């Protein structure tokens, strides 16, 4: 599972 923090880090 991908957490919100993980996603935002990839988006920058």
From Swiss-Prot:
Paired cysteines (S-S): none
Example of a GO MF term: lipid binding
Keyword Transport: yes
Keywords: Allergen, Lipid-binding, Transport
Coiled-coil regions listed in the entry: none
Function per UniProt: Plant non-specific lipid-transfer proteins transfer phospholipids as well as galactolipids across membranes. May play a role in wax or cutin deposition in the cell walls of expanding epidermal cells and certain secretory tissues.
Family: Belongs to the plant LTP family.
Protein name per Swiss-Prot or TrEMBL: Non-specific lipid-transfer protein
Organism classification: Eukaryota, Viridiplantae, Streptophyta, Embryophyta, Tracheophyta
């Amino acid at each position: 599972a991908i957490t919100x923090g993980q996603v935002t880090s990839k988006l920058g």
